Curated annotation (Swiss-Prot):
Sites bearing N6-(pyridoxal phosphate)lysine, chain numbering: K234
Functional note: Catalyzes the reversible interconversion of serine and glycine with tetrahydrofolate (THF) serving as the one-carbon carrier. This reaction serves as the major source of one-carbon groups required for the biosynthesis of purines, thymidylate, methionine, and other important biomolecules. Also exhibits THF-independent aldolase activity toward beta-hydroxyamino acids, producing glycine and aldehydes, via a retro-aldol mechanism.
Site (Plays an important role in substrate specificity): H233
UniProt name for this protein: Serine hydroxymethyltransferase 2
Pathway this chain belongs to: One-carbon metabolism; tetrahydrofolate interconversion; Amino-acid biosynthesis; glycine biosynthesis; glycine from L-serine: step 1/1
Species this protein is from: Mesorhizobium japonicum (strain LMG 29417 / CECT 9101 / MAFF 303099) (Mesorhizobium loti (strain MAFF 303099))
Amino-acid biosynthesis in keyword set: yes
GO CC, any one term: cytoplasm
Gene: glyA2
Location of the protein in the cell: Cytoplasm
Enzymatic reactions: (6R)-5,10-methylene-5,6,7,8-tetrahydrofolate + glycine + H2O = (6S)-5,6,7,8-tetrahydrofolate + L-serine
UniProt similarity note: Belongs to the SHMT family.
Amino acid sequence: MAEPGTYGRSSLVQVDCRVHELLLRQRRQERTMLKLIASENFASSAVLEATGSIFANKYAEGYPGARYYAGNEIVDELETLAIERLKALFGSEHANVQPYSGSPANQAVYRALLSPRDKVMGLPLPEGGHLTHGWSVNFSGTDYQRVPYGLHDKTQQIDYDRLRETARRERPKLIWVGGTSYPRVFDYAAMAEIALEANSYLVADIAHISGLIVAGAHPNPVVHCDVVTSTSHKSIRGPRGGFILSKNEDRYQALYHSTSKHNLAKRIDRAVFPQLQGGPHMNTIAALAVALQEAATPSFRTYGHQIVKNAKALAEALLGRGYYLVTGGTDNHMLILDLRDRPLSGKAYAERLARAGIITNFDMVPGDPRDPTVTSGIRLGSPAVTSMGMREAEMVQIAAFIDSVCRQPDDQEVHASVRRDVADFCTAFDVPGISDR
């Protein structure tokens, strides 16, 4: 036990050598492996500094100017700063930066807009949607009536005509637009027309593409949607957290919430706190404010467009090597390898790629005959390698690495050789938050 007056002065390696050793191992891994998971990225040193700051010590239940603890004048300024930066970047009327992550943000939307057993339309998980958009094992699929919409049989893209027919027939109270494994641009204008015809709230989940939207590399849903949710990491390169954007007023107030004295923005805030969460993580909000400052720069706009260029280059290189991609390509930061014509499962290929220093995740493909725990696909993403400074030429080399492993999935010597080549390949690039710390 530390002597009085000495607590808190020792470094991590002095206090806990085991955690320090794990940290060093993770750092080495991230410097020598290709991070191709579409939902991962590298936060900057500034974002990491704010995440590990003394703002982690402050309890701040409530909202700026209306806290349940004293001494929050500074964090009031901090949260207000994050809110204003977020609203400015996306052109939103209202913003809430307190959700602990994307799923809690989505749960708050359910609480603010719906009653239990209301109908919810969303893209099913096997076709690119998210658990919280009405999947059967999630609260959204058990507490609400789920009405799935699907993809066109030939293009594997959202079938907006069938979606419209389903919405007219089922008249869901909420329609989700967004996903975790959908490599194409969403037609927010078409979705808004469909939602209006059905008297449905339209909610966009932009967790994967928020950085692309800020950069102008993907359409902005804010003008078309009642509510927009997101994580604060992934392509926007912030801390692990979430946020919600919304209109101030509810266009369906008289229809669905006539007895409520609160407008849409207020109901969103009340759903986050006190209905679902307690004290916000002020260190995360501080880091989000920093990430939003970074995202407002011209260099971030260049970065966002390069993400898409790199994803397209990787897609073209893999197509040229005979691989099939869901939808035939990509418009955003991700691509889905359909490996149903290959001898092994998506999980098996992902494991072999990882041994070769290529980090991916196995993923379901439309019409997947395999169980979700093994799948027939692999999802690849370009945000992290783009943050390292890689461009189109490097994507061609990455495709060659992937092909070497997948063509010889049981040749461990090949995997070991690719692992060495990948490590050498990565040393030519800096890893943000690691190389500069």
